[in-house]
Amino acid sequence: MEKDQVVILEKRGVILVSGEDSRDFLQNIITNDINKVSNKNSVFSALLTPQGKYLNEFFIIQNVKGYLLDCSENSTGELIKDLSKYKLRSKVEIEDFSSEFVIGVINNSKFKELQEELKSNENTITYRDTPIFLDPRNRKLGARIISNLEKLYLTIKKLSLKIIDNKEYYSLAPVSYTHLTLPTTGIV
């Protein structure tokens, strides 16, 4: 992917976890440290069964309302169901925001340019009220933008980016990154 290109990822889901207990709630059930998540840092994490078996993986981004979880569209419903199992008496709301948010990916070089412009060296920056974060798994996978569609298009226009096809984006990824989500069926 070239510096001035962006791809809008299809088949991604966005879940909002909010409420006064949201930080403690997530800290107790995910594989990463929720205390690392701030408006300047985002993480990649997973949800496991109590026996340690894989259930789901997602990015966690801090939002004004709580935490956004960027996950596979196919697993959004299942992830909400799994998170809800652990809710118990926690003061937490778990909502599917997939219809309100989209995920875009920009080149790592463009992200570095924005970091310099905003005088930041963090892995998550806010550009015009839109969070943009460097993929914590591998910087070569670019930086993700999570926004509503209208705001994403305004950001794309302001940054003079050209939208490329999903297929072109995945064809540019190294073979080991073409299937980033683990299978959700057939796991014993």
Question: Where in this protein do the model-derived segments appear?
Answer:
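Single conserved hydrophobic/aromatic residue that forms the stacking wall/gate
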Residues: 179-188
